[in-house]
Swiss-Prot record:
Autoubiquitinated. Autoubiquitination is promoted by the human herpes virus 1 protein ICP0 and leads to degradation by the Ubiquitin-proteasomal pathway. Phosphorylated by CK2. Phosphorylation of the C-terminal tail by CK2 controls the nuclear localization. The C-terminal acidic tail is required for nuclear localization and is involved in the binding to SCF E3 ligase complexes, and more specifically with the CUL1 subunit. Pathway: Protein modification; protein ubiquitination. Changing S231A: Abolishes phosphorylation by CK2. Impairs nuclear localization. Residues 190-236 are annotated as: SCF-binding. Changing S203A: Abolishes phosphorylation by CK2. Impairs nuclear localization. The lineage of its organism: Eukaryota, Metazoa, Chordata, Craniata, Vertebrata. Residues 216-236 are annotated as: Disordered. Expressed in testes during spermatogenesis to regulate repression of cAMP-induced transcription. It comes from Homo sapiens (Human). Changing D102A: Inhibits polyubiquitination of NFKBIA. This is Ubiquitin-conjugating enzyme E2 R1. Changing E108A: Decrease in substrate affinity and ubiquitin transfer rate for neddylated CRL2(FEM1C)-UBE2R1 complex. Inhibits both mono and polyubiquitination of NFKBIA. Changing D103A: Inhibits polyubiquitination of NFKBIA.
Length: 236
């Protein structure tokens, strides 16, 4: 009897999963929502040091379509986020997650949208960049966008936007403690890279211990949070 065909998306996701095990992205931890289901990932995002998100533990979900990587996954925050480009539902409004169609009304170039050469790693890097550099030209949360622009234009004197973010960061500590997660608070901790050990047979496909002994990246600027002009960087 012939074996059922395995969708190519499963093979692609398995390869990406292994790649993220061997070369983790700084500031992220990924697990499966349900063991054995490659189409639903849980993502933990750690707030980059030297930004208003420092010390934060933000949880999200990545849901992949059956025709991945030809169609983009959906990225939704489970943690409540106050951000110009995040809807109240937690859905993220970012070009890389939009289908590769020519839509002149969107204001986006086709090259800015999803294409099959993109992957989970590029999505994660785009999301962390978006947190620090919101796009106020096409906001998903208008009120957050207005607050952010006031903060930006006042050069940090108007703190309504950042005060909300800091309150949300403090609120995530409960989730981190409940999940037994140690959140990085220094650049050295944030930039540490560890290689996940090969999973035992029958174990979860992902590594469980993010923080192990590892080498800190020699180039600190390879990590998020060093740019003096970053909009999310705390000002004195």
């Amino acid at each position: 009897m012939a074996r059922p065909l395995v969708p190519s998306s499963q093979k692609a996701l398995l390869l990406e999963l292994k790649g993220l095990q061997e070369e983790p992205v700084e500031g992220f931890r990924v697990t499966l929502v349900d063991e054995g289901d490659l189409y639903n990932w849980e993502v933990a995002i750690f707030g980059p040091p030297n930004t208003y998100y420092e010390g934060g533990y933000f949880k999200a979900r990545l849901k992949f379509p059956i025709d991945y990587p030809y169609s983009p996954p959906a990225f939704r925050f489970l943690t409540k986020m106050w951000h110009p480009n995040i809807y109240e539902t937690g859905d993220v409004c970012i070009s890389i997650l939009h289908p590769p169609v020519d839509d002149p009304q969107s204001g986006e170039l086709p090259s800015e949208r999803w294409n099959p050469t993109q992957n989970v790693r590029t999505i994660l890097l785009s999301v962390i960049s978006l947190l620090n550099e919101p796009n106020t030209f096409s906001p998903a949360n208008v009120d957050a966008s207005v607050m952010y622009r006031k903060w930006k234009e006042s050069k940090g004197k108007d703190r309504e936007y950042t005060d909300i973010i800091r309150k949300q960061v403090l609120g995530t500590k409960v989730d981190a403690e409940r999940d037994g997660v140690k959140v990085p608070t220094t650049l050295a901790e944030y930039c540490v890279k560890t290689k996940a050990p090969a999973p035992d047979e029958g174990s979860d496909l992902f590594y469980d211990d993010y923080y192990e002994d590892g080498e800190v990246e020699e180039e600190a600027d390879s990590c998020f949070g060093d740019d003096e002009d970053d909009s999310g960087t705390e000002e004195s």
